[in-house]
Design a protein with these regions (language model features):
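Conserved, structured core segments of small domains
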Residues: 1-97
Length: 97
């Protein structure tokens, strides 16, 4: 089954409002946990710079049978539903297959 990668950057407007940002991120964490309990192979985390400082965005990896179904799941991410991030979804292709 193919893997899909969602890349994201938090919108600058939300960098100021830490309480709202934290609330939405916590909803996102709960959403990922729920999907894992449903048996979906998903990983999600944030990126840090060379000083281990967060703020450069995040990455989500999802195993799904096709792009359409991956997109359907991703669009339910609270970070997307609340317009917290600029995001893009791509399929990862293993050239060694």
């Amino acid at each position: 089954m193919p893997f899909f990668v969602k890349t994201e950057i938090i919108k600058k407007d939300y960098l100021i409002n830490n309480d709202l940002k934290r609330k939405i991120i916590n909803e996102h964490i709960d959403w990922v946990k729920k999907l894992k309990k449903e048996g979906i192979n998903i990983k999600s985390g944030f990126l840090v710079d060379e000083l281990n400082k967060p703020g450069d965005g995040g990455l989500l990896i999802l195993e799904m049978n096709n792009y359409r179904n991956a997109l359907k799941i991703i669009k339910n991410d609270p970070m997307i539903k609340n317009d917290l991030v600029e995001w893009k979804l791509n399929e990862w292709v293993d050239p060694n297959k």
